[in-house]
């Protein structure tokens, strides 16, 4: 479990794109929040694993990420950091 205080971000499974669970998103496909906010993306899953639910936005709070979050990519103003 990862806990982090952060504002205005989206969390997405990186296999979810156009409703297709088997297509991986590229960094240019990330949907940022307003004002170039943070984007958090789950690690790509095995195709046999059902993609986890998407949490659209959390803000202004210390948030605990859902179980099964193996890798986080945070994109802020064009820079991507992986944790």
UniProtKB/Swiss-Prot annotation:
Region Disordered, annotated ranges: 15-36
Start-end of Polar residues biased regions: 21-35
Source organism of the structure: Invertebrate iridescent virus 3
Protein name: Uncharacterized protein 040R
Domain of life the protein comes from: Viruses
